[in-house]
């Protein structure tokens, strides 16, 4: 855990430099956030619409993604090419992302070009045309996106994992949908979805940077012209399984096996247990950091994979950052662990990770380890709030969760988590006996036989010896997966998301 210390010091310095970055201005509506930074040559826009894939009609998975990604493909005043050319001329950007609950439209422009930019941005939001030629192109792009997920073992494993975890629930399909549904999408489908979901009551929005009052007034006025109404989301909970289950995704000639292990949880950011779970997940395996237990046991001690991590909620990185992105708010969440060893070590890694997960429920983490992790997570706040754009994203996320103090009290909430409560929180929310395991493998039947067998292989890197780890390795090998043949399902990668 020593590698955390220097990083925490740098983070603390970053916080001191960060605090005066923006000031929060009063908006006429509680649904618009304004963060002013006079003198900054940039203006950021962010609109969050509760029109994500959870709102897809049952027979049309992927329609939310389809609709959102047509918004910037042509408006009343601009064709797709004209829009792209205009943005290029003024050095501005418009981005669209879609998750289960929300669509997020972002904009970035030089302050001196904000008038020209806003005339485009407002039309993307309020006046898309869903041109017929763009509908066909979008279908092709969306189908390519799904094929890309199948080709990428990491995204494939996560997609299968999420679909199964939330089977029968509104989260139970890829955000991008299925190939069969996409091929049937029409312009009218996109128009109706937009009409029914892009409503005032579904929208949260914000501005940051060199924001003038006149821009705020215009922005709010245009949002106020959106159709009134709000779509009430289903409150149905996902089904919770009480056994271990395995899905083997068969894909030829795999050098590694992508592993996902976890289960649905009954908390999200609105639950007081979120912060203890955030610490436990960081202790177990902070994303792309080397200090976590999984990283240490899988990579550092045994050299079985390049990384191993754990997440207390759905995780999507912010670009190339190690940090979680904004705009992936979810009512329903899940805990999961991941790694990617060579196939021969897949079973051993499953046992090792479940063993570490189990220890959190049976053994108290040392005070020193938690102190270091607590400092790391609390000080990470500096990078979560590093720019006006990131701050705007954090503020809108807390507004969506209806938690007005989440951002301001983030560090305090992390720092006040009692060490004595962590094991009981783990007992409440971590269930190693109830996990779903997804593995991308070359031969499903051979892997199934291995998982059901008595022996557990361990192939260390060339020249490495078990040494002092032999006794611990033997204990891990003896970990009982308690699997029956009916608990293991084999599927073909090429058949996923059809």
Annotate each predicted stretch with a short phrase.
Residues 1-12:
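Bacterial N-terminal signal peptides that target proteins for export
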Residues 35, 40-66, 80-126, 139, ...:
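M16 family metallopeptidases and their MPP-like homologs
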Residues 146:
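N-terminal glycine-/lysine-enriched basic segments
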Residues 135:
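Short glycine/Trp-rich loop-beta-loop segment that forms part of the substrate-binding cleft
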Residues 421-424:
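Mature hydrolase/peptidase catalytic cores and their serpin-fold inhibitory cores, especially
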Residues 182-185, 190:
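Alpha-helical scaffold elements lining the catalytic groove of polysaccharide deacetylases
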Residues 10-20:
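Bacterial N-terminal signal peptides
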Residues 24-93, 106-109, 119-120, 191-302, ...:
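His/Glu-rich zincin catalytic helix
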């Amino acid at each position: 855990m020593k590698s955390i210390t220097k990083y925490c010091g740098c983070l603390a310095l970053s916080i001191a430099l960060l605090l005066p970055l923006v000031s929060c201005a009063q908006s006429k509506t509680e649904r618009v956030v304004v963060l002013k930074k006079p003198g900054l040559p940039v203006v950021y826009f962010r609109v969050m619409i509760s029109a994500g894939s959870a709102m897809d009609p049952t027979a049309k998975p992927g329609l939310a993604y389809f609709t959102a990604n047509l918004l910037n493909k042509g408006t009343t005043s601009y064709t797709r090419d004209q829009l792209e050319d205009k943005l290029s001329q003024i050095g501005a950007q418009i981005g669209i992302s879609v998750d289960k609950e929300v669509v997020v439209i972002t904009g970035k422009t030089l302050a001196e070009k904000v008038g020209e930019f806003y005339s485009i941005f407002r039309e993307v939001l309020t006046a898309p045309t869903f041109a017929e030629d763009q509908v066909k192109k979008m279908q092709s792009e969306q189908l390519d996106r799904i094929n890309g997920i199948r080709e990428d073992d990491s995204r494939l494993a996560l997609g299968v994992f999420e679909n199964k975890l939330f089977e029968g629930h509104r989260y139970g399909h890829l955000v991008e949908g299925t190939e069969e549904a996409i091929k049937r999408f029409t312009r009218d489908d996109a128009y109706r979805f937009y009409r029914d979901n892009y409503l005032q009551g579904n929208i949260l929005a914000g501005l940051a940077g060199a924001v003038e009052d006149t821009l705020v007034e215009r922005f709010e006025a245009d949002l106020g012209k959106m159709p009134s109404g709000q779509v009430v989301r289903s409150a149905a909970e996902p089904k919770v399984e009480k056994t271990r289950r395995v899905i083997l995704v068969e894909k030829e000639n795999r050098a590694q096996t992508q592993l996902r292990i976890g289960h649905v949880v009954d908390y999200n950011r609105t639950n007081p247990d979120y912060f203890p779970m955030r610490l436990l997940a960081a202790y177990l395996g902070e994303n792309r950091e080397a200090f976590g237990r999984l990283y240490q046991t899988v990579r550092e001690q045994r050299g079985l994979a390049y990384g191993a991590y754990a997440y207390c909620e759905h995780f999507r990185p912010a670009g190339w950052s190690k940090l979680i992105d904004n705009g992936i708010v979810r009512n329903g969440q899940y805990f999961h662990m991941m790694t990617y060893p060579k196939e021969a070590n897949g079973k051993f890694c499953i046992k090792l990770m479940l063993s570490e997960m189990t220890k959190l429920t049976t053994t108290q983490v040392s005070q020193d380890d938690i102190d270091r992790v607590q400092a790391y997570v609390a000080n990470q706040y500096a990078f979560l709030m590093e720019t006006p754009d990131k701050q705007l994203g954090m503020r809108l996320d807390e507004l969506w969760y209806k938690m007005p103090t989440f951002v301001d009290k983030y560090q305090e909430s992390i720092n006040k988590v009692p060490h004595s409560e962590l094991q009981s929180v783990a007992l409440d929310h971590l269930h190693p006996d109830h996990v779903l395991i997804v593995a991308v493998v070359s031969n499903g039947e051979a892997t199934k036989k291995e998982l059901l067998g008595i022996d557990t292989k361990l192939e260390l890197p060339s020249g490495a010896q078990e040494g002092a780890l032999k006794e611990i390795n033997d204990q891990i090998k003896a970990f009982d997966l308690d699997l029956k043949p009916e608990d293991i399902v084999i599927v073909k990668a090429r058949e996923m998301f059809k």
